[in-house]
Amino acid sequence: MKTKIIKIFLIFAVFLAIFSFFRDKNVAYAKQGEDEKSVEDGTYEVLEKLDLESLEDYYSSLSDDESAFVAGGFKELLKRLIDGNVGVSFKDFIGEIFSLILKGALGFLPSIITVVVISVMSGMLKGLNSGFLNENTSEIVNFACFSAILTVIVSEAANMLTLTINTVGRVEKLSAALFPVLLTLMTALGGASGVGFLKPLVGVFSVGLTKVVKTFVLPCFTGAVLMNAVGNISPAVKLDKMADFFKKAGSIVLKTVFSAFFAYLLIGGVIGKTVDGVMINAARFGVKSYVPIIGGYVSDGFDVVLAGCALVKNAVGMTGLLILLSVVVAPVGKLIAFDLILRFAAGVVEPLGVSGISDMLMKISKCAGLLIAAIAGATFAFFAMVLTAGTSVGV
């Protein structure tokens, strides 16, 4: 009898446990669903209240090629990112980069063909020097060929310089459109300390770093190209050391300025995140502990609002990064193509016996690295600031 009672009790306990488990799970799922709906509602409410006009205007200014990474409208892109859909796969991204490099190389093809044809003519005329042309005539012909090649290459280098100036300027304008929105959302999340250190840094980036790139680094590129070009006109003209000076000066300034910027950003970001995290947790504890009766509900509502703001902040930051990529990928691809195509032309021209032209092409191709570094530095500085804004407020 006792055994039967124990069995009945155990069966009842098992059924009770199973019932309780499913009952608690249903309640948990319902609560989770309610929380998710509350966060979603809060997210879209925050999104509707944001002033995104400057970002929308910037987005509208993108060309068709630049819109490859950010297809669709600006608001649609933002909502996709909030839902966790980037819209661009890694494979598509890499494919687009190689496509842009190939497109840039094809764009330089007419100029490079011109350089090779003139170099072939110069080599042939040089071979005729002993038979039909006297030395003075040969030098004049070689100088004319070199001048024609120099005109083509310097013209392309000037186009690359203009492209770099425009790209750095567009990155500067994007920071002016994006960071006021991010700083507003950081303030709403309680990131006063992070905003306090990041706000002047945005100003330094917009005015200081881009100014250094435009007024010092890019003129160094111009000086290096001109010195390399003039220094290869004749063996009697030696300007290699001066060309190296311009190139080295631009490189050192870039490394110094961006290293100092990243160091300050790293230290300030860590301190800001720590202080803001303590303040937010203290606010949660204070509301929950000292507000009578409804303190717990207010604290939960506080968390929902913070979660919505955090989602919007991260989505806005990610949108800014995608737009940044769409702006800089094409110019960087074109600069890489410029570098590679000059090296290729130097290799083709070298066996023809016109060493001055080959050396000039190779040296100018090395100067192109300064332009790539200028855009890459501005891009990584922008990326680091967005990353700091995204992680500075722990929610």
What are these regions (language model features)?
Residues 314-355, 363:
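Helical hairpin unit composed of two closely spaced alpha helices linked by a short loop
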Residues 140-150, 171-179, 208-214, 245-259, ...:
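Small-residue-enriched core segments of transmembrane alpha-helices in multipass membrane transport
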Residues 130-135, 235-250, 349-358:
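Membrane interface segments of multi-pass transport proteins and intramembrane proteases
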Residues 334-342, 346-350, 354, 369, ...:
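Membrane-helix cytosolic exit motif
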